[in-house]
């Protein structure tokens, strides 16, 4: 059984390992630059490419959410109009 305390501890451990991984990656990159294995220009290019990919992914996600919200809104309006039309049709057929 997973309680809130266990979940909280697991989340903190996960966060700690993620931070440790980022620190190790940063130290490795600094070492590679220091020993001229890789240049800062290459790192900048890779960072720019990764940044553009992340920006496109986030933009597509938020555009999808926005479009889905508008679709739900218009579907609601069309549904209300159809219900009114159906009620009107039923009433006129009864008379």
From Swiss-Prot:
GO cellular component terms, semicolon-separated: plasma membrane
Membrane topology, record value: Multi-pass membrane protein
Compartments where found: Cell membrane
Domain of life from the UniProt record: Bacteria
Transmembrane is among the record's keywords: yes
Transmembrane regions listed in the UniProt entry: 21-38, 42-64, 69-91
Swiss-Prot/TrEMBL keywords: Cell membrane, Membrane, Plasmid, Transmembrane, Transmembrane helix
Protein name: Uncharacterized protein pXO2-41/BXB0042/GBAA_pXO2_0042
